């Protein structure tokens, strides 16, 4: 009989967290990852659930997520250790019927709790559910090195950073035509940064936290990971270009328009019209 540790969603979390650590995005206990599940995903594994699931109240009610299950990374847990002991480092939680709190159904052993960024994740899930008609299921936060570096040297403006990332790699406009949001620096792990992130998630699938990291969303673990990976690759190119003296030539506005038409995407207007 298959156990929950062999379920697709546990194995998927193991792969995503391991890949992110190998990328260098999630040092120590940095980063967090949540995946929204259907009841049908977890129903076959009820025998593996805790006999007395712990209940934790949310800092604010989230009725849109009522009766919804998630698999989440734990607070203070190292991504590099998820593959070694998923039961200690991951947890399946289910929001209660009025969205006021959640039960820990599986995992997070030894009184562990979900990531401290759970407010930002849950608020962002709410916005991405509305923005994508329920298609987006993953929220991923990590410390992508080159994206962080760019927030020190580029103007921290959504349209400007979006345009530069589009220019850093041709595929970027195709992968994230909705652009990149960016917040002012804020204290992590608070409702305030969660609300600000969620507000930008209404318009963008990527949101930068300057001098800290990035939030990405997507319909699957692969898509969310790939989104961040694509932006980070462009950021790496830009870091090298700026270190070599800056751009001598780049992808033009006309070429970006042609790219959008070819792949049937609508580029973020403010970034496209920033300059020729």
Swiss-Prot record:
<dbReference type="GO" id="GO:0019301">
    <property type="term" value="P:rhamnose catabolic process"/>
</dbReference>
<dbReference type="GO" id="GO:0005829">
    <property type="term" value="C:cytosol"/>
</dbReference>
<keyword id="KW-0456">Lyase</keyword>
<dbReference type="InterPro" id="IPR001303">
    <property type="entry name" value="Aldolase_II/adducin_N"/>
</dbReference>
<feature type="active site">
    <location>
        <position position="117"/>
    </location>
</feature>
<dbReference type="InterPro" id="IPR036409">
    <property type="entry name" value="Aldolase_II/adducin_N_sf"/>
</dbReference>
<dbReference type="InterPro" id="IPR050197">
    <property type="entry name" value="Aldolase_class_II_sugar_metab"/>
</dbReference>
<keyword id="KW-0684">Rhamnose metabolism</keyword>
<dbReference type="GO" id="GO:0019323">
    <property type="term" value="P:pentose catabolic process"/>
</dbReference>
<dbReference type="InterPro" id="IPR013447">
    <property type="entry name" value="Rhamnulose-1-P_Aldolase"/>
</dbReference>
<keyword id="KW-0963">Cytoplasm</keyword>
<keyword id="KW-0862">Zinc</keyword>
<dbReference type="Pfam" id="PF00596">
    <property type="entry name" value="Aldolase_II"/>
</dbReference>
<comment type="function">
    <text>Catalyzes the reversible cleavage of L-rhamnulose-1-phosphate to dihydroxyacetone phosphate (DHAP) and L-lactaldehyde.</text>
</comment>
<feature type="binding site">
    <location>
        <position position="141"/>
    </location>
    <ligand>
        <name>Zn(2+)</name>
    </ligand>
</feature>
<dbReference type="GO" id="GO:0008994">
    <property type="term" value="F:rhamnulose-1-phosphate aldolase activity"/>
</dbReference>
<feature type="binding site">
    <location>
        <position position="212"/>
    </location>
    <ligand>
        <name>Zn(2+)</name>
    </ligand>
</feature>
<comment type="subunit">
    <text>Homotetramer.</text>
</comment>
<comment type="pathway">
    <text>Carbohydrate degradation; L-rhamnose degradation; glycerone phosphate from L-rhamnose: step 3/3.</text>
</comment>
<comment type="similarity">
    <text>Belongs to the aldolase class II family. RhaD subfamily.</text>
</comment>
<dbReference type="GO" id="GO:0046872">
    <property type="term" value="F:metal ion binding"/>
</dbReference>
<feature type="binding site">
    <location>
        <position position="143"/>
    </location>
    <ligand>
        <name>Zn(2+)</name>
    </ligand>
</feature>
<keyword id="KW-0479">Metal-binding</keyword>
<protein>
    <recommendedName>
        <fullName>Rhamnulose-1-phosphate aldolase</fullName>
        <ecNumber>4.1.2.19</ecNumber>
    </recommendedName>
</protein>
